[in-house]
Amino acid sequence: MDEAGRDKLWKNYISTRSAEYRDELIVEYAQLVKLVAGRLNMYLGYNVEYDDLVGYGIFGLIDAIDKFDYGKNVKFETYASLRIRGAILDQIRKMDWIPTVSYTHLRAHETGAY
C-alpha cells in the first residue's frame, strides 16, 4: 500500500475506531514486526523462537495502533518500532527466572557502582 492509502486507512480508523480498519492496519504493518523481531533474534542469547518473538511483537503493534496520536508530526513506524521492541523484551523478561531487580544489582556490581 502506498503512503496515500495508509493515510486514508489511518483517517478511517481514527474516525471510526473500527476493528476492521484496525485489522487492516495490523496486516499493513506486520512486516515491521518481522523486521524488529529479526533484529532482536540476532542479539538475544535466549532460546526463543523467531515466531514467538513475532507473536510478542504483534501485541506491541496492536498497542501502538491503539495509542498512536496521528495528529502529532511523528512517523508511525518510528513509534511502533519502539513499542514492538518493548513488548518483545517484556515478554522475554517475564519468561526469565531471574527478576529484573537482580539484573540491576548485577550490572551495578559489575560496573563498580554497587
Task: Name what the model sees in each region.
Residues 1-98:
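Alpha-helical promoter-recognition and RNA polymerase-docking modules of transcription initiation factors
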Residues 104-113:
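Conserved small/polar residues in nucleotide/adenosyl-binding loops
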